[in-house]
């Protein structure tokens, strides 16, 4: 048995099994994410939300997914059929692909590569192609305008996200997500995590993540009052389901990145309590709760306001922060205290 597992076929089967586990976790989480999002939104609006299908409405998401899958796929006249159907698949696959390098605990990662942050950033950046392809292939003005908005918005806020991540890389000296979490380990629990020395960047990362995932109040590419449903107007059935699933998976990915980069990942916030997967999942769930609350209580921005904030506020501030972190780390200002603190020392 040991010889087989060390053989080429054994390694391939092991990687395939691990990949299926990651996909299973993402898909099961997706069911609860949609359910939780709808429940939180309903609670803010003093409604009950899903409560009929299954206990407490837990099976409502399953019923909705089945409804989408078995619906007829309506293809409008004049669309580019290959590109039209390829677009949602690209968005979904890229959203799932990024989870291959997300560690949940020491050893609980599909591929613990040294350029994990770069891999995640590349996969999330490529998702914009699915949106652009879907809007262009639909042969309709509303999807096309929505896709153009989405492309401009995602590219604008990816710059800020990249600069924020560079600050973390400078502090850690590594692009490996496991190493970044290990650098935040210390005797003071949550006060060793990067949220404290990089506090301004936590807020910027959260807001940029909202814009990057087209989440309210930055859901301009699919603003109902302006573009109906944006680039998704002409989609129905399974293709629409893939777009929606990719969006929620990308949101949960941003929650995972916030947990890993700023809040210690699987590390316990209280010294003495054991570290583990529980803390990682709990932090991700908390950040998704914040995403859902923002959706429920913050009004939508105008498109010009969104772009102005991204280029005139977030970009210069995050760039200045990178310069500051690099200066403090290089010249060991304040006797090296800040550098050792920011580097987990």
Swiss-Prot record:
Keywords, A to Z, come to: Cell inner membrane, Cell membrane, Membrane, NAD, Quinone, Translocase, Transmembrane, Transmembrane helix, Ubiquinone
InterPro entries in the record, alphabetically?
NADH_UbQ_OxRdtase_su1/FPO (IPR001694), NADH_UbQ_OxRdtase_su1_CS (IPR018086)
**Gene Ontology cellular component terms for the protein in this record:** plasma membrane
Q: What is its EC number?
A: 7.1.1.-
| Location of the protein in the cell | Cell inner membrane
At the top level of its lineage, which domain of life is listed?
Bacteria
Membrane-crossing ranges are 11-31, 50-70, 84-104, 115-135, 161-181, 187-207, 248-268, 277-297, 309-329
One GO biological-process annotation of the entry reads: aerobic respiration
Reactions mediated catalytically: a quinone + NADH + 5 H(+)(in) = a quinol + NAD(+) + 4 H(+)(out)
Does the keyword 4Fe-4S feature in the UniProt annotation? no
Provide the GO MF annotations for this entry: NADH dehydrogenase activity; oxidoreductase activity, acting on NAD(P)H, quinone or similar compound as acceptor; quinone binding
A Pfam family it matches: NADHdh
- How does this protein sit in the membrane? Multi-pass membrane protein
Entry-linked HAMAP family: NDH1_NuoH
Subunit: NDH-1 is composed of 14 different subunits. Subunits NuoA, H, J, K, L, M, N constitute the membrane sector of the complex.
- What's the stated role of this polypeptide? NDH-1 shuttles electrons from NADH, via FMN and iron-sulfur (Fe-S) centers, to quinones in the respiratory chain. The immediate electron acceptor for the enzyme in this species is believed to be ubiquinone. Couples the redox reaction to proton translocation (for every two electrons transferred, four hydrogen ions are translocated across the cytoplasmic membrane), and thus conserves the redox energy in a proton gradient. This subunit may bind ubiquinone.
Q: Which family does it belong to?
A: Belongs to the complex I subunit 1 family.
PANTHER family, from UniProt?
Answer: NADH DEHYDROGENASE SUBUNIT 1 (PTHR11432), NADH-UBIQUINONE OXIDOREDUCTASE CHAIN 1 (PTHR11432:SF3)
- Would you tell me the protein name for this molecule? NADH-quinone oxidoreductase subunit H 1
What taxonomic classification does the UniProt entry list for its organism?
Bacteria, Pseudomonadati, Pseudomonadota, Alphaproteobacteria, Rhodobacterales
